[in-house]
């Protein structure tokens, strides 16, 4: 996913975009 984890920096809005 990467919604709040920052793993999918591009899927949602990762904190570490």
From Swiss-Prot:
Query: Which tissues does the record link to its expression?
Result: Expressed in abdominal perisympathetic organs and abdominal ganglia.
Which InterPro entries does the record match to this protein? Pyrokinin_CS
Principal localisation = secreted
For this chain's UniProt record, which GO biological process terms are given? neuropeptide signaling pathway
UniProt-annotated location(s): Secreted
Specify whether Secreted is a keyword of the entry: yes
Listed GO CC annotations: extracellular region
Q: What keywords were assigned to this record?
A: Amidation, Neuropeptide, Secreted
In-chain residues carrying the UniProt-annotated modification Leucine amide: 17
Named from the GO MF annotations, one term is: neuropeptide hormone activity
Disulfides per UniProt:
none
Span of the secretion signal?
none
Query: What family, per the record?
Result: Belongs to the pyrokinin family.
Function as written in the Swiss-Prot or TrEMBL entry: Myoactive.
Record protein name field: Pyrokinin-5
């Amino acid at each position: 996913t990467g919604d709040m984890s920052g793993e999918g920096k591009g899927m949602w809005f990762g904190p570490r975009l």
